[in-house]
Amino acid sequence: KLFNHLPKQYNVIAIDKLAHNPQYPLNDNWQNQVAEMISFVESNKGEHEKVVAVGHSFGALVSYMSACLRPDLFSALVMLDPPLMTGLARYLFRFAKKTRLINKITPAGITLLRKQKWHREQDLHAYFSKKVLFKDFDPDCINDYISSAISEQGDHMHLNFDVETEANIFRTIPHNLPTYAGKLKVPSVLITGKNTDVCVPVLRKPFLKTNPSVTHIEFKKGKHMFPLEYPVEVAHAIANVLTNINK
């Protein structure tokens, strides 16, 4: 739904399931996913075109690292509530990755409990609407999730992404952001949800300090998943950002 409300002059390209390509197996600090993103952009952008990288959470941070390494591919960067491990938190996460603690301080442990199969006659919209993660989603975004993340197989419907991979995404969250400090050369904006519990001030302030070219905007409402809670308004916010960048 968000994509449908972006300015029509933009052609949206996106990796179907980041970190699920066997050519780019998930690894620590998401280095292979950065390579996957760069390769995808190189292969899918038009000749002489540059790409506006727009990402949420995992995708936002991969977009940031990609833009730092290959600024020639991008004209702008819009990050929506990325998980920024800065300051003391990055040392905690570096240690936690070596222990089971990482399953407790990230959603990795909960992810492994995710239901993966439903009977084909079950009302999935009703099912997901009751879940904590989805309860504040725009109804159309729940439908978008169902149509993109679930496929029918015989009498049942199954998740079409790997929950172990999803858990490992959390387990390998980058703790090396200082290595990218000062490398961001493209116009960039960080948009955070007003009530986010992920990209919180204590984590984003050090990031903004080491990336002075990034402009921070606080979206007027919403939590970490605000792009799926208010897709139309977030699309308009992104459009406004791009208009200002292009002035």
Locate each region found by the language model.
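Conserved hydrolase catalytic core segment
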Residues: 50-92
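Post-His helix in hydrolase/transferase enzymes
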Residues: 228-240
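Short amphipathic alpha-helix adjacent to the substrate-entry channel of hydrolases
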Residues: 1-12
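Conserved serine/cysteine hydrolase catalytic core
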Residues: 140, 150-206
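Catalytic histidine-centered segment of alpha/beta-hydrolase-like enzymes
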Residues: 219-231
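Active-site loop/oxyanion-hole signature of alpha/beta-hydrolase fold enzymes
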Residues: 13-54, 93-95, 236
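Flexible "cap/lid" loop of the alpha/beta hydrolase fold
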Residues: 76-117
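Conserved alpha/beta-hydrolase catalytic His-Asp/Glu region
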Residues: 112-171
